[in-house]
Amino acid sequence: MKELSVNNLLGIKYINENDINLVFETADHFKEVINRPIKKVPSLRDITIANIFFENSTRTKLSFELAQKRLSADVINFAASSSSVTKGETLVDTVNNILSMKVDMVVMRHASPGAAVFLSKNVKASIVNAGDGAHEHPTQALLDAYTIREKLGDVAGKKIVIVGDILHSRVALSNIYSLQKLGAEVRVCGPKTLIPKYIEALGVKVEPNLRKALEWCDVANMLRVQNERLDISYFPSTREYAMQYGLDKNLLDSLNKEIVIMHPGPINRGVEITSDVADSRQSVILNQVENGVAVRMAVIYLLASKIK
C-alpha cells in the first residue's frame, strides 16, 4: 500500500505532489463509498479521534466529524469555550490530558499561526491542522484542488486567480502551495492593502484589476474579507470593496469565456460574490463542500494507517 511521506498534516508546505495525488486517489474511492446507500466503512473501528476547535467553524468541523464517522472511528468533540482552557490551561496540557484517554489523532483549529506544528513537536499523536490563524488550512486546499481536477480533468496547466483578502486568509496560502505543486499558475487579486508583501516571493503575480484577472483565469476562487482579523480599516467601505472586487452576474456574463467559480465559505453575499453567481451553474461551491468529506476521509484514513 502507498503511504504518505508525513505522519501529520500540518500544512501543504510540508507535503509533496505524490502525497497530494495519493490523497486524491484515496478520495476517489471514498467518494464512491459515500454515494452508496450505506455510506459507512469499518476502516477505523479501532481509532479514536479528538476534534479540538479553539475557533468557530461550521463546514470544516461538520465535514471532519462526518468523515470520521463514515470511517467508523470513535469521535470526541472538544469546545475550547467550555473547557479548562478558559481557566488558563496550556494547549499542550489540554491535548495531553485528552491523549491520556487513549486518543490516537487530533484534528485542531487554533487562532495562532504555527499552533499545529508546535503541537506536533510536543505531543505523541497524529495531528491534522484544521486551520491555524492566517497561516494554513491544508484540507481546504486539498478539496479545492480536488474539485478543480474533477471539474476540469487536471490541475496542471490551469490558471487560477484567488480574489479578496489574501493577507488574512489561511485558505489562500494553502491553495497557492497546493496548486503550484500540482503545476497550476496562480495569481491573486484584491486591494493592495490586503495583499501580503511576500506574495511575489512565492512566484505569484498580483493582478489589481478584477476584470483582467477573470479574463486571464480558468478558475476564480472568491474569498471573503476576514473582518474578525481586521484591527484597522483596510479599505474605505464594504460598498466600495464590493464595487471594485465583488463578482456579479453582469461581470461574469461579459467575459468572453466560461470560468469556474469557487468559494471556501462562509459567503458574504453581495460583497465578494452575488447570489446569482454563487448559485449559478458555473459555481462549484456545493461540490467543494461535498468533496470535503471524501478528501478528509482520505487524509484521516492515510494518516491512521501510519499509526497502525
UniProtKB/Swiss-Prot annotation:
Keywords: Pyrimidine biosynthesis, Transferase. GO terms for molecular function: amino acid binding; aspartate carbamoyltransferase activity. It holds the Pfam family OTCace_N. L-aspartate binds at residues 87, 170, 224. It is an enzyme of class 2 (transferase). Gene3D superfamilies: Aspartate/ornithine carbamoyltransferase. InterPro entries: Asp/Orn_carbamoyltranf_P-bd (IPR006132), Asp/Orn_carbamoylTrfase (IPR006130), Asp/Orn_carbamoylTrfase_sf (IPR036901), Asp_carbamoyltransf (IPR002082), Asp_carbamoyltransf_Asp/Orn-bd (IPR006131). PROSITE patterns: CARBAMOYLTRANSFERASE. It catalyses: carbamoyl phosphate + L-aspartate = N-carbamoyl-L-aspartate + phosphate + H(+). GO terms for biological process: 'de novo' pyrimidine nucleobase biosynthetic process; 'de novo' UMP biosynthetic process; amino acid metabolic process. Pathway: Pyrimidine metabolism; UMP biosynthesis via de novo pathway; (S)-dihydroorotate from bicarbonate: step 2/3. Its EC number is 2.1.3.2. The keyword Transferase applies. SUPFAM superfamilies: Aspartate/ornithine carbamoyltransferase. Carbamoyl phosphate binds at residues 59-60, 109, 137, 140, 265-266. Catalyzes the condensation of carbamoyl phosphate and aspartate to form carbamoyl aspartate and inorganic phosphate, the committed step in the de novo pyrimidine nucleotide biosynthesis pathway. Belongs to the aspartate/ornithine carbamoyltransferase superfamily. ATCase family. Heterododecamer (2C3:3R2) of six catalytic PyrB chains organized as two trimers (C3), and six regulatory PyrI chains organized as three dimers (R2). HAMAP family: Asp_carb_tr. NCBIfam families: asp_carb_tr, PRK00856.1. This is Aspartate carbamoyltransferase catalytic subunit. It comes from Flavobacterium psychrophilum (strain ATCC 49511 / DSM 21280 / CIP 103535 / JIP02/86). The lineage of its organism: Bacteria, Pseudomonadati, Bacteroidota, Flavobacteriia, Flavobacteriales.
